[in-house]
Amino acid sequence: MREKDYDYLGIIFKNHSSHLIYAKIFKEIFVVSYEKQNKVNHIEIKRQKGQIWLQLKDNPDTLAFNNTAIYFLGIGKELVDTTKPIRYEIYIHLSIEDEFCKEYCYLLPIVYNNGTIMYGTKKEISIKEMNKIYKDPKLLIEHFVN
């Protein structure tokens, strides 16, 4: 696998306890907060410019940035070679405008330029679907909130 095969169009994270989904799609970060009240999802979506770094929970020395993140974390090959769902516990470091935060999340699907990957969830998500999410981030709720 060449390094460029690890480039992705989108990468999605979910924090169960704070009801947040983070999605880095193309060059934008989406922060989607959701809360279910009386069987109705209340959704707030922020679309922001920013950067994202990844850090494996079990290895605080691993810190990687944007497109090289999966490659440098050493899990890229495993993602490409497997079809079984795996969950990595991960911290994401966000730099949005002048704010910086660190969130504990599960790593959800990564959509690569070379095709569809099923990862961390039972649903497959394609490049076409990731483009739809970019246009309408509410679809993140449909895909990843039970």
What does each of the following model-derived ranges do?
Residues 1-146:
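Amphipathic alpha-helical "stem/stalk" segments
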